[in-house]
Curated annotation (Swiss-Prot):
It is found in: Nucleus; Mitochondrion. This is Uncharacterized protein YDR514C. Keywords: Mitochondrion, Nucleus. Gene3D superfamilies: Ribonuclease H-like superfamily/Ribonuclease H. Pfam families: DEDDh_C. One of its GO terms (molecular function) is nucleic acid binding. It comes from Saccharomyces cerevisiae (strain ATCC 204508 / S288c). InterPro entries: Gfd2/YDR514C-like, Gfd2/YDR514C-like_C, RNaseH-like_sf, RNaseH_sf. Present with 125 molecules/cell in log phase SD medium. SUPFAM superfamilies: Ribonuclease H-like. The keyword Nucleus applies. The keyword Transport does not apply.
Length: 483
């Protein structure tokens, strides 16, 4: 058998395995590390360091824990101040960079002029295309169909609206961001907040159980604090991946792959639901609320991809969220006194993308690819929060936008359209080393050489994971991330 035929057969075998959503015995054996306690292994759960083997999980236990939840920290308390480094951050005030601010304002002024020109040309061209549609309809049917209860008229109206929508979908550039409008102001404010390096960014991502979306299985958090990055060449980003212990054995498999044990940025923290809430609340109370006069000089923002859903999930499990500024329109109070809460901004990567390029292709994975951000194992909450934060930092960096031509909406539109075409024409890429390693892992008999000696297995995937660690309380889990 030729090597190409072997590779083809191996590829087909793994595609078949993936199609079965990790339900085949071969993939389960490969996916799970050795040494699992039996009760969790039967549920496809990952090995967790330090976890009592007899500890149980499941839908019933999750809902029981959820019904008894008590958020002990409330809206203000945080034990993160007990750690010297973090407590010292309260004494750092934001110092405006006059030269940088001038460059940002110059960029925003040019952006408004550019977008206004693009909007006028795009609208004029789209109007001509729509007039042509109307003309063809009148020639063919005598008139433009109005809304009617008559079935024939109703079907004609439906077809007409579909033709209009097709023209709008194919039109480039998509312009949802007219200068002077609320969306353009949101875009400009986002760029100003991030480019000036004065905003503490708190990115969140929540994964739920697809067979009961009231059950939160993972929470990912990634934090960029400019107070820690004043003198940094490489940005310091603090990433956390929380796995709800009661939901540990619950695996998604119908709509998305379950990658809860594939966190790339450290060790996953497995905590009881109540302690997950305490962990999140302590971070929010520290980063998103002001305690000192110096604190009030910084802006604060939650970051997410379609973030409203993640905020809703946090509230559902009992997390107290500060008052939010969804549209970035609430006035800033420069005279705010010590301890008084400022509105926390909401920065949404999906919203920014849709404003500039339209709603089509707005998934996180597609945006990461479009803006050249390496990524893997999406739908792990910790990974997604980290990627979303990086994406937002790029979208809000005026210099990055200039370098990649993000504001050339026509060129970006054709680039996005090209990706859609390639997706339709090209197969998904699955690394051959992963294909063969899965096949090797399923071999019941080891390979031997001509002398009967066992051959070492090769083509081991090189992605390294730190695994998961059980903690009884949130404070101990947080402390473990500082080492």
């Amino acid at each position: 058998m030729s090597s190409s035929t072997k590779c083809k057969k191996a590829y087909e075998a793994v595609v078949k395995m993936v199609t079965h959503r990790f339900n085949s015995k071969a993939v389960r054996n490969y996916h799970q590390p050795q040494g699992l306690n039996r009760s969790l292994a039967t549920r496809n759960a990952a090995r967790v360091r330090g976890m009592v083997p007899s500890r149980r999980g499941g839908v019933g236990l999750y809902k029981s824990s959820s019904s008894k939840l008590m958020n002990k920290l409330g809206r203000q308390k945080t034990w993160i101040n007990e750690f010297e480094h973090f407590n010292s951050l309260h004494e750092i005030a934001y110092t405006p960079n006059i030269a940088l601010s001038s460059e940002i304002q110059k960029y925003l002024k040019a952006l408004e002029t550019n977008y206004r020109s693009i909007y006028e040309k795009s609208s004029e061209l789209l109007d001509k295309k729509l007039e042509e549609i109307d003309k063809k309809w009148i020639e063919k049917n005598g008139c433009i169909p109005d809304a009617s209860k008559d079935d024939v008229e109703k079907n004609l109206r439906k077809q007409y609206l579909a033709d209009v929508q097709d023209v709008k979908n194919e039109h480039i550039p998509v312009m949802n961001c007219e200068p002077g409008g609320s969306q353009f102001k949101y875009l400009c404010k986002t760029i100003e907040l991030l480019s000036s390096n004065k905003t503490i960014c708190f990115a969140i991502d929540v994964e739920a159980f697809e067979f009961d979306t009231d059950i939160v299985t993972e929470i990912g958090i990634a934090i960029y604090d400019p107070r820690e990055n004043i003198y940094s060449l490489m940005p310091i980003i603090r990433s956390y991946h929380l796995i709800v212990a009661e939901a540990l054995p619950l695996r998604n498999k119908k709509f998305v792959c379950d990658f809860k044990d594939c966190f790339l940025l450290g060790e996953s923290l497995v905590l009881p639901l109540e302690q997950c809430v305490e962990f999140i609340q302590s971070l929010i109370n520290f980063y998103m609320k002001c305690e000192t006069d110096q604190d009030t000089t910084w802006e604060r923002a939650f970051v997410g991809h379609a973030i409203a859903g993640d905020i809703k999930w946090l509230k559902k499990i009992g997390v107290h969220v500060p008052e939010l500024d969804n549209e970035l329109t609430k006035p800033e109070d420069s005279t705010e006194s010590k301890g008084v809460r400022k509105h926390v901004k909401m920065l949404d990567t999906e919203k920014i993308y849709s404003m500039c390029y339209g709603k089509k292709g707005s998934s996180l994975g597609k945006l990461l690819r479009l803006f050249h951000l390496p990524h893997a194992f999406l739908h792990n909450a910790g990974n997604d929060a980290y990627y979303t934060l990086l994406l937002m930092l790029k979208l809000g960096d005026y210099n990055f936008r200039k370098q990649i031509g993000a504001d050339d909406l026509e060129t970006m539109g054709y680039r996005i359209r090209e990706w859609f075409k390639r997706e339709a024409d090209e197969p998904k890429i699955l690394p051959m080393s992963y294909v063969l390693s899965v096949m090797n892992a399923n071999n019941s008999k080891p390979k031997v050489d001509d002398k009967g000696r066992k051959k070492p297995r090769d083509l081991v995937p090189q992605t390294e994971f730190s695994g998961s660690h059980w903690f009884q309380n949130a404070r101990a889990a947080f402390k473990s991330t500082l080492v």
